[in-house]
Amino acid sequence: MKDRIYICHTYYHVYVTFLKELKLRAEADPARKAGTATLVLSKMSNNFENLKARVESTGLFEEVLEFDEKREDFFPELAKYRKDTGSFLGNLKNRIRFTKEYARLEAPYVPVDLRTYKDIYVYCDSDPIGYYLNQNRIRYH
């Protein structure tokens, strides 16, 4: 099992992640291998340009991945669940169906098996990755 994974959507998320990892490294046993975390950069909200290569050059992370997270309009089959049914219960049912289906459709785009990590840090769980984690009952911070 791997130690940690951070899923970042903004430069600020990456900044906070660096601070967390640097603190962990400072407190860690010197005999332990540094850089045991994975950093995932979601391309949905931000163009990180060459940040992936820059982060890799630091050696702070074992792995740096880009995540091509998909917006709901990428999947036209989800549109039917967004229509107003005219009733609270009908809309609630559609919302439940929407979240389940969205998580299923997003799954092929998730770049790693998140179940192989002890700790998962997600800064923005209202994005598709949050639906995926919740529907698959994967615990995260």
Regions found by a protein language model. Give the residues of each.
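Active-site and donor-binding regions of nucleotide-sugar-utilizing enzymes
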Residues: 5-141
